[in-house]
Amino acid sequence: MYLPRSSGQISQHKEEYGNSQKRIAVIVLFFTMILSGVSFLAPSNIIAQEVHSRQASSQQERISFRVVSWNIENLFDTHHDSLKNDHEYLPDAIRHWNYSRYKKKLADVARVITAIGEWNPPALVGLCEVENDTVLRDLTRRSPLKELSYRYVMTNSPDLRGIDVALLYQRDLFKLLSSRSISIPPFKQHRPTRDLLHVSGLLLAGDTLDVFVCHFPSRSGGAKESE
């Protein structure tokens, strides 16, 4: 067994032990988010999970916050994107997707996110099926959600319909370090699919948290078709 003898050796030993604990915390949180990321596979469901971190203090006080994943299903604006197949969600299309219906959907989404948080809004909200930056800007700046000051990152996938995934985050609980899209190569003759979103951030306790937002094909056509 190694026993540090001088004050300098003791200080170095404490520093190395502290760094080791921080690395362990990062690994634990990473796997916590992997489990939460699996929940993104369930469309139309809202899944909330509590994540805990420890403050770097003598009391080891726990910091908890809520992580939510939600397939909000076809959050399109009312304008045609010539590069995407979004014709179904236009004012003169079969769904009559006009500005009034669009604003109502924004308000409904904002209301649900706020209600999930109860007294404390979710720190992280993974969203599936958002069309573009415009709808996220409207959701976070022009809906009741604007009071919560969410910021967001999103993918820009080659999906033919133009739907993407995104992550909303509270800046006072999650400091964004990086974000990137992970492309999924088309399999044989299959059409392009949605990218994965990988986001890294820093928690209040100094731990690093990695989040993966995924939106895999539905099984509406059967398991064999989706695979």
Locations of regions flagged by a protein language model:
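N-terminal, active-site-proximal structural segment of metallo-dependent hydrolase catalytic domains
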Residues: 46-147, 153-163
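Bacterial N-terminal signal peptides
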Residues: 27-42
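Extracytoplasmic mature domains of secreted/periplasmic and thylakoid-lumen proteins
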Residues: 149-184
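N-terminal secretory signal peptides that target proteins for export/translocation
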Residues: 1-22
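Active-site regions of metal-assisted phosphoester/phosphodiester hydrolases
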Residues: 2, 48-95, 99, 170-227
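Short, low-complexity intrinsically disordered segments enriched in small and basic residues
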Residues: 12, 45-46
